[in-house]
């Protein structure tokens, strides 16, 4: 199965009639493995900041999480495994696997819990596969 199939079929899937706004699977080095049509163009330093927060949980909290220049307020995640951000009526969930970062971006009416479920389920599957 291609990485694009994971994005199209497993991240951009229907959840109680709702869908993520955008999603992507990105290597730890910032290389895009696959992305949905609406995934924003991020900056390399934003991925560096995200990777630093996984290594040193809480490092993004004072400054916020930036993705494509948009600031998200960092909310409770799972240290070293999941970063969650909130911006207005939407937000982002980022799950770290051994080799990749799984991004899910949502807007209402999708809920943070629905986004978390989709992103973390995919991330857990990839971890189980050794990825």
Swiss-Prot record:
Record-linked PROSITE patterns: PROFILIN
Tell me, in one coarse class, where this protein mainly resides.
cytoplasm
Q: Which UniProt keywords apply?
A: Actin-binding, Cytoplasm, Cytoskeleton
Q: Which SMART domains does the record associate with it? A: PROF
A Pfam family cross-referenced in the UniProt record is: Profilin
**Superkingdom of the source?**
Eukaryota
| GO cellular component terms given for this protein | cell cortex; cytoskeleton
**Location in or out of the cell:** Cytoplasm, Cytoskeleton
> Which GO MF terms are attached to this record?
actin monomer binding
Function description: Binds to actin and affects the structure of the cytoskeleton. At high concentrations, profilin prevents the polymerization of actin, whereas it enhances it at low concentrations. By binding to PIP2, it inhibits the formation of IP3 and DG.
Self-association state and partner proteins as the record states: Occurs in many kinds of cells as a complex with monomeric actin in a 1:1 ratio.
Q: Which family does it belong to?
A: Belongs to the profilin family.
Q: What is this protein called?
A: Profilin-1
- State the organism of origin: Lilium longiflorum
């Amino acid at each position: 199965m291609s990485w694009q199939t994971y994005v199209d079929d497993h991240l951009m899937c229907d959840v109680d009639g709702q869908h993520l706004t955008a999603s992507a699977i990105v290597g730890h080095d910032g290389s895009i493995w696959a992305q949905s049509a609406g995934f924003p163009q991020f900056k390399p330093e934003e991925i560096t900041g995200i990777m630093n927060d996984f290594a040193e949980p809480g490092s993004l909290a004072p400054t916020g999480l930036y993705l494509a220049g948009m600031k998200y307020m960092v909310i409770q995640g799972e240290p070293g495994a999941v970063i969650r951000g909130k911006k207005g009526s939407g937000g982002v969930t980022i799950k770290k696997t051994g080799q990749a970062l799984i991004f899910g971006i949502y807007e209402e009416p999708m809920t943070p819990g629905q986004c978390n479920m989709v992103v973390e389920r995919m991330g857990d599957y990839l971890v189980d596969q050794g990825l």
